Amino acid sequence: MVVFIGPTLLSGIGQFLNKYCELLNGDYVQLGQDFLPNQDIFLFALPIGPWLEAIPHIKKKSRKVVCMTICETETVHPDYGKLLGLFDEILTPSVFCQRVFQRQFPGTRCRVILAHVPLVPPPKEPVFGVPSDHYVFYHIGNVIDQRKNVKKIIEAFLRLQLPKSLLVLKATCHTQVTWKVPGVHIINGLLPDEAIRSLHNECHCYVSFSSSEGVGMGAVEAALYNKPVIITDYGAPPEYIKSRYTIECGRQEITQDDFLFQKGMVWGKPNFEQLLEFMKEAYDNRVYYQDHQWTRDQVDGNRIKNEIRVLFDVDKKPVSENALVF
């Protein structure tokens, strides 16, 4: 059995890692909690104090430890070098991240293992009661994160003034979001998976306008349900989703320090006019369906399960010919 150690399940990384955990029938342990010795360990870590302090102790206690990390900018915080230096090989969920790490930290070995996003049918009865006669745009994520540009999505929605349309925001923040905006509905708090599946089923067009994404799990989930998905072309989303509604990005510098982001780092500058264009086109044509078989193939559980098992020499199965190893 593999033990997966990560942050709280309230976080995006926690939810990401837990999907691997469920795929392999492993145990999820939150950083700081105890676990049995001589186990195989899969970490999802960031280069911050609690992780950098804990990893040497975890390695001493365990049979084998592998580590995944993620990034969203052209250059990353120098402390990533400390994290990468603790392992002979680091795992990342995208080629975008792999290239960033290998360019900034020459000699780094990176293996790409894509995110696992299971496709589970939505509940038969709707949870939220979204009006069936409205066209509904939606977004799931930390809506107060500057990287997500959610206020620009709201601005686009208000500027378009589309009759019988709604914008639903599922906020995954640690604080309540209380914005009062006409036609914009905000859902706070941690929801069970069944409710999230219902949200995808009840809404129509997923909108992401991020300056960058290490993966973009909300958009990937929407694609699995064959929703029209608006994404940006900077970062990892195009590695998971092929959509005709892909917004072109220029480049811009970050203007202020925020967590691991530092002023002067570079990420995407998505085209606002394209956001308006794509939202209006989806609405005008009442686009409810977009085939995303390619996304399903990318996040296939059988392949990803085998790739993780190989990391720990479980049954010594060879990596499949489709495995993304670089």
Regions found by a protein language model. Give the residues of each.
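N-terminal pre-catalytic "stem/leader" segment of glycosyltransferase-like enzymes
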Residues: 1-49, 324-326
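Extended catalytic core of nucleotide-activated donor transferases of GT-like folds
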Residues: 27-102, 194-195
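Acidic anion/phosphate-binding donor-loop and adjacent secondary structure
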Residues: 78-79, 116-134
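Conserved donor-binding/catalytic core segment of Leloir-type glycosyltransferases
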Residues: 129-148, 154-158, 168
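Nucleotide-activated donor-binding/catalytic signature segment of Leloir-type glycosyltransferases, i.e.
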Residues: 175-198, 205
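Aromatic "clamp/platform" in nucleotide-sugar-dependent glycosyltransferases that forms part
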Residues: 211
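Short hydrophobic beta-strand element within catalytic cores of glycosyltransferases
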Residues: 228-231, 245-248
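A charged, aromatic-enriched C-terminal amphipathic alpha-helix characteristic of glycosyltransferases
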Residues: 266-277, 283-312
